[in-house]
């Protein structure tokens, strides 16, 4: 619940800032109307950056890979006993 309140308060603050810019005419009106679009595009770029950084720092887990291979072999044996063709590998 606290996270939702943070997000909503941030959105209200950004909206108030945007409306203030529209009313004050500090920035030309044609540029001010585009600020929400810039914000959404920037947020998308930030999200893609965070996904990319997460993928670059993704840890390798050799122990988990061995366990996964054991699970795969166990599943193949199980299905072979049930009469299912699981391939030659």
From Swiss-Prot:
Pathway: Protein modification; protein glycosylation. It is a multi-pass membrane protein. Component of the dolichol-phosphate mannose (DPM) synthase complex composed of DPMS1, DPMS2 and DPMS3; in the complex interacts directly with DPMS1 and DPMS2. It comes from the Eukaryota. The lineage of its organism: Eukaryota, Viridiplantae, Streptophyta, Embryophyta, Tracheophyta. Regulates the biosynthesis of dolichol phosphate-mannose. Regulatory subunit of the dolichol-phosphate mannose (DPM) synthase complex; essential for the ER localization and stable expression of DPMS1. It holds the Pfam family DPM3. GO terms for biological process: protein glycosylation. The keyword Transmembrane helix applies. One of its GO terms (cellular component) is endoplasmic reticulum membrane. This is Dolichol-phosphate mannose synthase subunit 3. InterPro entries: DPM3. Its main location: endoplasmic reticulum. Belongs to the DPM3 family. Keywords: Endoplasmic reticulum, Membrane, Transmembrane, Transmembrane helix. The keyword Cell wall biogenesis/degradation does not apply. It is found in: Endoplasmic reticulum membrane. The chain crosses the membrane at residues 7-27, 33-53. Disruption phenotype: No visible phenotype under normal growth conditions.
């Amino acid at each position: 619940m606290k996270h939702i309140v943070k997000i909503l308060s941030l959105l209200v603050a950004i909206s108030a800032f945007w409306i203030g810019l529209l009313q004050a005419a500090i920035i030309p009106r044609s540029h001010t109307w585009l600020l929400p679009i810039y914000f959404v595009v920037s947020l998308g770029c930030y999200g893609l950056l965070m996904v990319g950084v997460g993928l670059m720092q993704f840890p390798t887990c050799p122990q988990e890979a061995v366990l996964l291979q054991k699970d795969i072999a166990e599943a193949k044996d199980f299905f072979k006993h049930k009469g299912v063709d699981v391939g030659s590998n």
